[in-house]
């Protein structure tokens, strides 16, 4: 089966970053990272989801967290220099990022937004992120993702 390269994959190629494109079966009724991890047969702690938020001071920013967790809005606000923040409404995701729910990658959005990745990403030799479409994940080293996304490592949920 031929896998079409996504914008995120092309940007990783351009940056000479090693990665794998891993397809999985999409369930339109369950777009969760938990489903993705189960489909891949991988540890949910290594399958990260991308969330877009809006802060009261900084505007839009991106949080990347392990799939089974929910972002702590107070911690996200603190990390991003805001007093408060909230997830953006779903209807804003595509026009803002170029991505849809279940296929939002921290790499290759229409515009670069400040990006924050939960610190546990460094516990693993590789993690999974969306490749920018439903049904396709990027498997890459966390340090490569941090570098390419120009991300800061921080705590985004209480463990």
Task: Describe these PLM feature segments.
Residues 1-159:
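Extended, low-hydrophobicity, polar/charged segments
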